[in-house]
Structure formats: C-alpha cells, structure tokens
Design a protein with these regions (language model features):
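Short coil/turn connectors at secondary-structure junctions
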Residues: 1, 15-17, 53, 120-121, ...
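Hydrophobic helix-and-loop "lid/oligomerization" segment in the mid-to-C-terminal part
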Residues: 62-187, 192-224
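Short alpha-helices
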Residues: 7-76
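Short intrinsically disordered, low-complexity coil segments enriched in acidic
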Residues: 1-6, 34, 200
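Hydrophobic/aromatic beta-strand patches that form the interior of the parallel beta-sheet core
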Residues: 3-5, 18-21, 123-125, 159-161
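Short, glycine- and charge-enriched coil/turn segments that flank and shape catalytic ligand pockets
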Residues: 1, 39-44, 133-137, 166
C-alpha cells in the first residue's frame, strides 16, 4: 500500500491508502521529521537521517529565506544540529560545487535569454536545446536559475521555460500573494505552491513562450 506525506496543494490523494498533506509545512522533510518525533521515535534519529532531512528543508525554503520558513523549522534544525549535523558541508556540496560550464551558462542566459516585462512586474527566460548543448548542461544544472529573476527590483513574478527532449518544462516563482500554483494549473498543466510551481507543455518552445506572453496580459492588475 502507498502512503502519502506531502506539502503541495491538491495532491492526488486518491491513489494512496493513507496519507497527510499540509500546505503550511515548509517541506515534506519537515513533515517526516514531525512524524518521527510525534510517533515517539526521536531516539532513532541519527546523523545520516539528520543530513537527509536538513537537505530537503534547506532546499525547499531557499536556504531558509522563503516566508514558509517557520519558527518550528528553526527548532527542527537546532535539534538536528544537536545530533551532529554539519550544515555548512551540505550547503557547500549543493550550492558551491558547480562546474565552470554551469557558471558560464548562467551568465550567458541571463545576458541573452532574459526578458523583463516591467509593465507586468515579470521576468521570463526561454532556454533552447541548443543553449543546453553548447554548455553541456544536464538535467538539474538549471535548478534555481529562476530565482535569479526575482532578484530584480520590482519583479514579482518569474518564469523560465526549458526545451527538454520530451517536452517543455516551466518553472514559476513569485513574491507576495501572486499565486503561481493557480497560474500553472490554469495555463501550463502544472501546479505546486503559492510562490513556487512548475508546468509543462507538449508544444514547441516558441509556441509555449508565445502563450506565456499572451496569458500574462490577464494578470497585469494582480501584479501591480
């Protein structure tokens, strides 16, 4: 039987025998930690488990800077530290361990593929297969790229579409109360959270990008 532990909006609960979904939690790893503690199994937590739980929480909270990061999250991390967690090593392995080609790719797409739509407080980036091949970029190397767009002053909505072999993959991020989960579900067969979601398209890169430019017009007032 399948058991669901999830923090996304509208999970497919019907395919699980048991489960819980809590969108107020920062991550599934926080929920797993709560389950271990509340079931009276805190004594089974060790350094290896602590590393896994910390990794999930750190990445899902944007290194603890997203609004979903609660006091409970910090208390959890404090407990994991008491178990011997070396958090800086995990951070270095995930965020400070990239190949030179990835950094050059990031600079290239920020310079050549980013479009800032100030009338919608939105930034979008469209990345082709050729771009990926030129820098030998693999799946996962584009993780977090969408967050760069939100560092622009005044930008409330960021979107990246990447031309993968099987389909076009969208990543959406937002600030404030603009719900990218609703946006992704309505327009790009996706979903996720209020401020972070994903989507997909079986259309061409040019066509799905053009669709974004068209539908964003519906949200100008919300994004002011």
């Amino acid at each position: 039987e399948k058991i669901l532990i999830d923090h996304h909006q509208e999970p497919q609960k019907e395919v699980f025998a048991y489960g819980i979904s809590n969108t107020e939690k920062s991550s599934t790893c926080e929920m797993v930690y709560d389950f271990i503690v509340e079931s009276g199994n805190s004594n089974k937590l060790n350094t290896t488990i602590a590393q896994c739980l910390y990794t999930g929480v750190m990445t899902d909270t944007g290194s603890f800077r997203f609004p979903i990061t609660s006091a409970a999250v910090h208390k959890m991390v404090a407990h994991l530290k008491e178990l011997g967690l070396q958090h800086s090593i995990i951070h270095d392995n995930i965020y400070d361990n990239f190949l030179e080609s990835r950094l050059r790719f990031t600079g290239f797409v920020l310079l050549n593929r980013m479009d800032v739509l100030y009338e919608y407080n939105t930034a979008i980036m469209s990345i082709s297969k050729r771009d990926l091949q030129e820098f030998n970029i693999k799946t996962g190397d584009t993780e977090g790229l969408v967050n760069y767009l939100l560092t622009i002053e005044g930008i409330k909505f960021a979107a990246i579409v990447i031309d993968r072999e099987e389909e076009r993959k969208w990543s959406f991020r937002s600030k404030g109360n603009f719900d990218v989960n609703i946006f992704a579900r309505k327009h790009f067969e996706g979903g996720g959270h209020i401020n972070a979601a994903g989507g997909r398209s079986s259309d061409t890169l040019n066509n799905t990008t053009a669709k974004f430019y068209e539908v964003i017009k519906e949200y100008q007032q919300q994004l002011q």
